[in-house]
Amino acid sequence: MKASTLALCCLLVGVQSSCAPARTATTPAPSSASASAEQEILNLSRQKWRWMSQRNVDSLAALFDEKSVFVHMGATFSKSQELEVIRSGGIVYKSVDVLDESVRFVGSTAILLTRLRLVAVVGGNEVTNPFVVTEVFVPQGGKWTLASLSFTRLLTP
């Protein structure tokens, strides 16, 4: 009886092992080129937030692609509309508390997801919102340009 129980246990362990998903190699560390590009995107995004809070529309205009789009809660803007909203104080970015960032590359396009808490003045009212912000950067003429910026408000703080 003991021998048959032991054999059954060994058989079950063998079946379980053969049904388990095959182990894959660990994800290789990013190459220095992609790590460098990732850091460049992170730095550029952080600089963009500073320019937005300083209302530095000249620097933002150089960063924003001509065909860029900006998606806010309740509004979608073109490059010129976004710059005007910032210039006029329609939205004043007071502070950005970055909680988490991740960069992904699809071909030569960089997608940055940033979880943050934003304090802004919108229409004269100060608001604080938790967001995930999606930024899409594309290489143009040897530099990165911002093609899209989208705010998604989180339900949890």
Residue ranges and their predicted role:
Residues M1-A7:
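Bacterial N-terminal signal peptides that target proteins for export
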Residues M1, G14-V15, P28-S31:
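Intrinsic disorder/low-complexity segments
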Residues C19-A62, K67-P157:
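A beta-strand edge to alpha-helix "cap/lid" segment located at domain peripheries
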Residues A7-Q16:
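Bacterial N-terminal signal peptides
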